[in-house]
Swiss-Prot record:
This is Orotidine 5'-phosphate decarboxylase. The active site is at K59. The keyword Lyase applies. Keywords: Decarboxylase, Lyase, Pyrimidine biosynthesis. Its EC number is 4.1.1.23. It holds the Pfam family OMPdecase.
Length: 227
């Protein structure tokens, strides 16, 4: 079990101010679209200089060759983990796996199933008249069959996916909120302890840590709750 701190920052300066208060031996960090678009690869390199392993959360989704090139570009940066959208299809994600293997990269590749902000009505709006958990199961199975390292899923789906896919597969879980935290824009949320019990391997936690008065103490408190 590991914690990935989502760096909810617009600038490299703000991101580095957050990680100044964190211990790289206790967590990894996630760089998302907003921060990466503002700062580019330099923010990844700066975080690595501070000894943090980086999950580059850009959710690539394009034609197979373009997506694979982007994934390999991320691997060239030395990131620990990168992700793609499983809904891009088998050919797209398998091409990414093949290119990473051909380049002898060690970067972990995972896939996004259904965004944690999406409910049944949201899926219906895009032509999928199905419960989110059923679509998650479909895409997780496709991801496993295609040779990826894991999926992003809500903790409420983790137990189901463990039974469906088995143990040798990472379940990276956003929507984690310690007891008493605001749900913000996440619809499918759960506590760190429950996520661990349900089979999640990596917990993505942002605002409860980054907006805390003392991020380090909050991180330690969360770690203690799942010890």
């Amino acid at each position: 079990m590991s914690i990935i701190v989502a760096l909810d920052a617009k600038s490299q300066y703000d991101a580095l101010k957050i990680v100044e208060q964190l211990d790289p031996t206790l967590c990894r960090v996630k760089v998302g679209k907003e921060l990466f678009t503002h700062e580019g690869p330099s923010v990844v390199k700066k975080l690595q200089e501070e000894n943090f392993e980086v999950f580059l959360d850009l959710k690539f989704h394009d034609i197979p060759n373009t997506t694979a090139q982007a994934v390999c570009a991320a691997a060239d940066l030395g990131v620990w983990m990168v992700n793609v959208h499983a809904s891009g299809g088998r050919k797209m994600i398998e091409t990414c796996v093949e290119r990473l293997k051909a380049g002898n990269y060690q970067t972990q590749l995972i896939a996004v199933t259904v965004l944690t902000s999406m409910g049944r009505e949201d899926l219906k709006d895009i032509g999928l008249d199905i419960e989110p958990v059923e679509q998650v199961k479909r895409l997780a199975k496709l991801t496993k069959e295609s040779g990826l390292d894991g999926v992003v899923c809500s903790a409420q789906e983790a137990k189901i996916l463990r039974e469906l896919i088995g143990q040798d597969f990472s379940l990276v879980t956003p929507g984690i909120r310690p007891e008493g935290s605001n749900a913000d824009d996440q619809k499918r949320i759960v506590t760190p302890k429950q996520a661990m019990l349900d089979g999640s391997t990596h917990l993505v936690i942002g605002r409860p840590i980054t907006k805390a008065e003392n991020p380090t103490e909050m991180l330690k408190s969360i770690l203690a709750s799942i010890a």
